Design a protein with these regions (language model features):
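Sec-dependent signal peptide recognition
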Residues: 2-7
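C-terminal motif of bacterial Sec signal peptides marking the signal peptidase cleavage site
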Residues: 13-15
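Bacterial signal peptide processing site
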Residues: 17-19
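Active-site signature of cysteine proteases
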Residues: 33, 117-255
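Active-site nucleophilic cysteine motif
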Residues: 38-53, 82-91, 197
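Structural recognition of the beta-strand scaffold that forms the well-ordered cores
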Residues: 43-46, 70-73, 92-95, 103-106, ...
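Structured segments of extracytoplasmic/periplasmic soluble domains
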Residues: 47, 51-60, 95-102, 182-183, ...
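Papain-like cysteine protease catalytic cores
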Residues: 64-130
Length: 255
């Protein structure tokens, strides 16, 4: 989201500072599918949540590469969807359960017709049947942190992107960070969202000063110094996070 403005800001800062990109050492990098490019669309939330689901399956040894264009096509059938096509990771989960999902190679452009069937390992499925094997109902939980609502209770985020009025479990920020860290260290898929952008968290790194960062899988192609990855400091996680989606059982794990 807001990609053009972001790129202009990055270009201006780089032109003024002329500084090389910051160096990061990877402490943990989870498996992921190839970096994709959302183009000029504001559908980063689709790419981020699908990337989290893909990483989750890769951690099981199951290779899944999903089509963001299929979900973008299904938005045409959603009367509540804003013209911007913005949404949240929780929105993506709802849409998968409603419309299903197909593999990336089955639909590589939003301008192509949506496939009626998915062919996998010699078997034929509807998109809805395939979706049930990719993302079980209630498999993921949506989390947030706001001091304006009671902690450990569910709340509806009052933001335009939450046009399906999904509910989020409200946690103290330190707890949200700890749960996110646990999920990443256990190789689970995690979708992270600010008010402006969404990415998948795929690992942990540190800079030359030893400061910790999350490794982020972006959806802006492989141009740039980090070849499609980005880095989010733990401090920025605390100040910028709007929501996180991750496997439900991670929240209730004992350690």
């Amino acid at each position: 989201m807001k990609r053009i403005i972001y790129l202009i800001m990055v270009f201006l800062m780089a032109s003024c500072a002329k500084q090389p990109p910051q160096h990061f050492t990877h402490d943990l990098l989870n498996r992921m599918t190839p970096i994709k490019d959302q183009g000029n669309s504001e559908t980063c939330w689709i790419y981020a949540m699908l990337a989290a689901i893909e990483t989750e399956h890769l951690s099981w040894g199951d290779s899944v590469n999903l089509s963001p264009y299929y979900i973008e096509k299904m938005l045409e059938q959603e009367p509540q969807c804003p013209a911007s096509r913005r949404g949240m990771g929780a929105t993506l989960i709802r849409l998968i359960h409603k419309y299903g999902i197909v593999g990336y190679n089955a639909m590589r452009s939003v301008d192509t017709p949506a496939p009626r069937f998915v062919f996998m390992l010699g078997a034929e499925y509807t998109p809805q049947e395939f979706a049930r094997s990719v993302c079980a109902r209630d498999e993921y939980v949506a989390l947030t942190s706001t001091s304006r609502e009671p902690y450990y209770k569910e709340t509806v985020l009052n933001v335009p992107d939450n046009w399906l009025h999904d509910r989020f479990l409200n946690l103290p920020m330190d707890s949200l960070l700890a749960i996110t860290l646990r999920a990443v260290r256990q190789h689970h898929g995690v979708c992270w969202e600010s008010r402006a952008h969404a990415m998948a968290i795929v690992g942990i790194a540190h800079n030359d000063q030893g400061e910790p960062y999350f490794i982020m899988k972006n959806s802006w192609g492989t141009d740039g110094p980090y070849k499609g990855l980005d880095y989010l400091s733990f401090d920025d996680f605390k100040t910028q996070t709007l929501a996180v989606e991750l496997p439900r059982f991670v929240v209730y794990a004992s350690n």
